[in-house]
């Protein structure tokens, strides 16, 4: 079969779709990656993928620009003569599915990995964008054969918008690489070197990995660090850009948190930390939490959508109240003080992470594709 993976960003394909693509190629399907030109385009080609570039204005709400992008994409898809397409993210799941229908692609799948910042933010623009997105989804419901969700909350949201039950499938997580993320014992000499390289005190490390967005809980993390600075090192890893949803560099470089920016040594950071924290306001199914679990770390997450499906409270981590720095600091403090609890949660976390092996998840996708195609 000729299969297309459609995304508004090459990074999404590169980091999250490769296990599924590999599984499809292993069974001799022909796979095309359809993305805008960006810094990941060549990386995808270097992996031996057939990359098709299309025009896309990611931030534009101009209807004329959107229509131009739509018809260009529809033409690209029609020329590819695909048997089925897998989209992901709002614009691909709406305009992309509509373009795929126009291009007469027989089977159309949409993946919802989370609702995003517009479903957290308030104000006229956020409300308007939500209304537009919801309206477009209602239209795309008619033309997608299956919507795949990474959590039950998002599935319920779309169900309430009018998505029929027979078009809903929940596959939790996009999977993680367990050959890369696994528990290890860090010898004292290596931990000493790690402290030295980060230029931090010899105290337990509380790590947060996320883009420096306010709705990821950056404010609460910094406030907790201030409360617990004598007990632990608080480290934030994640990139930022210039938009109001991101914390400023001035904020990030102040306070009791060591802000490291974007890093490539995520495995080493996870294996050397003592506690992993994600105090987000809303998630899809957080990959960073699964990677921390796979490394055998005790975890604290906020009790928000997505996080509560990735962590079972008091089994493989703890829930803290969303947008509540005091409760977050209390949960972190509990783990710092109770080593037995911390180690027990970490052990359970590592065991639970096994079910999210990327190869297992990839096979679930393939079985879904085959089932839907057989029954359409």
From Swiss-Prot:
Pathway: Protein modification; protein glycosylation. Keywords: Glycosyltransferase, Transferase. GO terms for biological process: lipopolysaccharide biosynthetic process; protein N-linked glycosylation via asparagine. InterPro entries: Glyco_trans_1 (IPR001296), Glyco_trans_4-like_N (IPR028098). Its EC number is 2.4.1.290. It catalyses: N,N'-diacetyl-alpha-D-bacillosaminyl-tri-trans,hepta-cis-undecaprenyl diphosphate + UDP-N-acetyl-alpha-D-galactosamine = N-acetyl-alpha-D-galactosaminyl-(1->3)-N,N'-diacetyl-alpha-D-bacillosaminyl-tri-trans,hepta-cis-undecaprenyl diphosphate + UDP + H(+). The keyword Membrane does not apply. It holds the Pfam family Glycos_transf_1. Signal peptide: none annotated. It is an enzyme of class 2 (transferase). GO terms for molecular function: hexosyltransferase activity; N,N'-diacetylbacillosaminyl-diphospho-undecaprenol alpha-1,3-N-acetylgalactosaminyltransferase activity. Adds the first GalNAc residue on to the isoprenoid-linked bacillosamine (2,4-diacetamido-2,4,6-trideoxyglucose) carrier in the N-linked protein glycosylation pathway. Acts first on the undecaprenylpyrophosphate-linked bacillosamine (Und-PP-Bac) substrate to yield the disaccharide. Belongs to the glycosyltransferase group 1 family. N-linked protein glycosylation in C.jejuni consists in the transfer of a heptasaccharide (GalNAc-alpha1,4-GalNAc-alpha1,4-(Glcbeta1,3)-GalNAc-alpha1,4-GalNAc-alpha1,4-GalNAc-alpha1,3-bacillosamine) from a membrane-anchored undecaprenylpyrophosphate (Und-PP)-linked donor to the Asn side chain of proteins at the Asn-X-Ser/Thr motif. This is N,N'-diacetylbacillosaminyl-diphospho-undecaprenol alpha-1,3-N-acetylgalactosaminyltransferase. It comes from Campylobacter jejuni subsp. jejuni serotype O:2 (strain ATCC 700819 / NCTC 11168). The lineage of its organism: Bacteria, Pseudomonadati, Campylobacterota, Epsilonproteobacteria, Campylobacterales.
